[in-house]
Amino acid sequence: MAESHYSPGQLIWLKLKRNRTAMFGLGVLVALYLSSFFAGFLAPAHYATQNREVSWHPPQLDDLHLFDAEGTFRGPFVYGTKRVHPAISEYEVEPGVVVELELFARGDTWSFFGLFESDLHLLGWSDPKRPIFLFGSDLYGRDLLSRVLYGSQISLSVGIIGILISMSLGMFLGGVAGYFGGRVDFALMRFIEVILSIPGLYLILTLRQAFGQDLPSTQSYFMIIIVLAFVGWAANARVVRGMVLSIKENDYVTAAEALGVSRVNIIRKHILPNTWSFAIVTATLYVPYYILSEVALSFLGVGIQEPEASWGNMLKDAQNIRNLTDYSWVLVPGFFIFLTTMAFNYLGDGLRDAADPRSKL
């Protein structure tokens, strides 16, 4: 069927589906955001649950078994471990002790965005005193798998909320500047230049110091989003302005003006919709910047604070060289940061190619 039979959105989707790397990135992001959304159910334990007796327990993902020593199928299980010495984080396997990995097990109570509470988890273990650490544990004996899942709620949502705010501001103010021109354009462009001169990360560091080290994690979370969105919209607005300067010269805009359509409706119905392809592609490519900014700030200790979990403050354990050499699983959050960034870049590149009117279906 000819391309003229499809809407612009359908054309972009059809082109995107043919890009395997872009679809791979989309699939990874869907999986990550779904697991983040249902983190309380998927996580075996609460992110703050501690057990100092099993601090720095190595990952047991490779130690999962399906058959016991006699060849009998038992489902997924691990052999129990015991600490070699109370002062040393070394463990030895107890072959005679079997700890089963259970599905739909009862455990710590979690809340689904304040709507309801439950203690049902997708994964659990048969012996509450012998937890199974698939990704290992940290200094306080907290399950890294659970903290990665809970941490994704903060790290992944920062990117989405931040880009929604910055793109909305950028498209609106850029559209206003480009359409009205004159003094409005001049004033907005000078304001944008001021915003572009503000270093976002340093502004957050300054505000964090001004508010003190006791700032709750919730307030730090919103401060990071607001500041990053405040300094991020200006670059988008400048690009949208340039697009609007070209779009407003089209015949359909002139016809709408001749028919007496209000300027606000012209911008909303005829101009901004023509910038959506740019907005979608830009948003996809910019989300990793917001995620990495939160990670960097939490890694430096000025973002999300303990005991809350975010991928950034989980990586703080990697600042210690001994931790890196002895407990390499502290880098597990880094793998998910890399995976997320890679997926967004793959998807963004695919969307950019699909939105290109010169590309063929």
Which residues fall in each region the model found?
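Alpha-helical transmembrane segments of integral membrane proteins
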Residues: 137-361
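Gly/Trp-centered helix-boundary motif
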Residues: 1-167, 171, 260, 303, ...
